[in-house]
């Protein structure tokens, strides 16, 4: 094993080589002997990265961890406390929060520990495989849960009362199916189809997407199709048709209002336009965030298998992985906490949270009482 004491001491400015490391040293030279067998030949072609990257990534992951714990923990807590939130649709939201929270608690602490311990994998090879499998399980579960959430919203908005109703039994089945799919596609590397290896700057573990044999290629193509392309297609299909259905509905409403009352048309147009813009923006944000976070990592995987892998540097692999895991931070805010019912639950159960959402039932009662008072007078 290469001597890592010298470079670590020298990085503060010997100036003998880039970042103070001896010439010819690679990023793989810092890996302990017990996990050397998990380093792919690809990583021996790259010099060590600036050590400050390890500390920067550690700080970023700590920041994301705090946000993820707060957001996903809040969603689960509110669901357990508020009876009004215990609906079949919200079961999918809670399943998403649960998978994101498990990703956080199983992947973030070891990664941060490695980052602040010199940027090396500090655990055993077996734990590297477990770490990668847990990240794969929770990541795939989140992707498929998002797919099911988008399809449920499509069914509600586009089919309305004519579509099949989401029951508690169906929601339970869908949540279970997401976990079965994720576990089913994450276990094969333990049995010889595909493998888990050290990745990027070698302080985390993931799929092997560089070895170009039939075993690795077929496994990675399958997970790309079933764990990225298919759910991505459903998500895009759902939100495209949601936006189309909303615009078609509002156009029909405007036409009807125009026939009935020209005065109401003006007031309805302003409100309708705001609603259209708000829903279109929400759909665009949902789809855009999903693709922004997951597409770079999927692209790196395919390039590593089928394209020019020389351009895939340690940092170029690490940053897309960070982007993909950041989903666990924004998901609870986009899909739950921004919803009026969740905000109302925060107001009721956590009044110190500085969220003041009005109960629509109270508003209706006040309006009704005001109307009755005016009629009596």
Curated annotation (Swiss-Prot):
Cytoplasmic side: 79-90, 152-170, 247-281, 339-377
Extracellular side: 1-53, 116-131, 195-218, 306-313
Post-translational modification: Phosphorylated on some or all of the serine and threonine residues present in the C-terminal region.
InterPro entries the record matches: GPCR_opsins (IPR050125), GPCR_Rhodpsn (IPR000276), GPCR_Rhodpsn_7TM (IPR017452), Opsin (IPR001760), Opsin_lateye (IPR001391), Retinal_BS (IPR027430)
Signal peptide: none
UniProt superkingdom: Eukaryota
Tissues where this protein is expressed: Expressed in all of the seven retinular cells (R1-R7) forming the main rhabdom in each ommatidium.
Transmembrane feature ranges: 54-78, 91-115, 132-151, 171-194, 219-246, 282-305, 314-338
Topological relation to the membrane, as annotated: Multi-pass membrane protein
Disulfide bond positions: 128-205
Keywords: Chromophore, Disulfide bond, G-protein coupled receptor, Glycoprotein, Membrane, Phosphoprotein, Photoreceptor protein, Receptor, Retinal protein, Sensory transduction, Transducer, Transmembrane, Transmembrane helix, Vision
Glycosylation sites (chain numbering): 3
UniProt subcellular location: Membrane
Annotated positions of the N6-(retinylidene)lysine modification: 325
Name by which UniProt lists this protein: Compound eye opsin BCRH1
